[in-house]
Amino acid sequence: FQISWKAKVARTFQNIRLFGGMTVLENLLVAQHNPLMIASGFTFLGVLGIGGYKAREAEAIEKAKFWLEKINLIDRADDPAADLPYGDQRRLEIARAMCTDPVLLCLDEPAAGLNPRESADLNELLLSIRKDIGTALLLIEHDMSVVMEISDHVVVLDYGTKIADGTPAQIQADPR
């Protein structure tokens, strides 16, 4: 796997960064702000439909709804993001990152603080992103069960030094 320096990269943080005062849907739409502004021509006339804004806005809403369905939050679209349980907030943050259509999604400790059910839901989502959507994932994770379940290649670091590199099966067979 190689990635160009021009590739679109998205990132989620260990500490969830949502706009708590915005709705769940608005959190997904804000990720698509730049394409919407470009479609508007950066003018008020663009918002009125001149310059393709309305068509782009409809596409943004469809993409947001796709991700809301994928993370099972379509029925909470109008709820404030701050009112969601922690596991739902984590999945919403990942969906927001995916609304930017990244080639590579970097996740810092995505399973931190999740209970077993939430962790299983997260693993299912990340596996779907990797296999169905085709987005490469870069996981920074201490929970090796998460890494082994969703990864096709693992690099183990010890204070920045690579100590193991291979498939999950190879890493499990030789856990240095």
Model-derived regions, located:
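Glycine-rich phosphate-binding loops of nucleotide-dependent enzymes
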Residues: 1-176
